[in-house]
């Protein structure tokens, strides 16, 4: 996986925060990069009993504008999947335009994404 040194720390922090919030992480799918996330998200939403999905990763700036295109498409597609399956899909993917150092400084985005997913699940249940 791209930038596994960073995403591993995000995963650990996200799991700890989920446990703190009383949520369980029942399934984890590792993707080679953020470009591959939408398919994994769709599989998780269609297979099994999933209340929400949290995406964790980082998009680091390269020599071209590729990072901006990937970030734009990723956010759009996971938003589409959330709406299509009526389940929260939280974005824990900082970027684009970041250096590796900036990505390391944003590892706590994992906590924010987990918290957003848990809050959305609770709020959606309140409305039904």
Region spans (language model):
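Glycine-rich phosphate/diphosphate-binding loop of Rossmann-like nucleotide-binding domains
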Residues: 1-30
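Short, acidic/small-residue loops that bind anionic groups at enzyme active sites
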Residues: 70-95
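Short, ordered loop/turn segments at secondary-structure junctions
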Residues: 1-2, 57-59, 93-97
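A charged, well-structured terminal subsegment
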Residues: 107-128
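Phosphate-binding/catalytic loops
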Residues: 96-108
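Glycine-rich phosphate-binding loop
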Residues: 39-78
């Amino acid at each position: 996986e791209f930038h596994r040194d960073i995403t591993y720390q995000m995963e650990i922090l996200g799991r700890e925060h989920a446990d703190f919030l009383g949520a369980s992480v029942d399934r984890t799918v590792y993707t080679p990069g953020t470009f591959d996330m939408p398919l994994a998200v769709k599989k998780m939403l269609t297979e099994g009993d999933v209340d929400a999905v949290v995406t964790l990763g980082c998009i680091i700036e390269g020599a071209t504008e590729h990072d901006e295109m990937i970030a734009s498409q990723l956010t759009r597609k996971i938003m589409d999947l959330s709406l299509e399956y009526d389940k929260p899909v939280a974005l824990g993917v900082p970027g684009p335009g970041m250096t590796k150092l900036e990505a390391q400084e944003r590892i706590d985005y994992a906590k924010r994404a987990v918290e957003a997913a848990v809050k959305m699940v609770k709020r959606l249940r309140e409305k039904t």
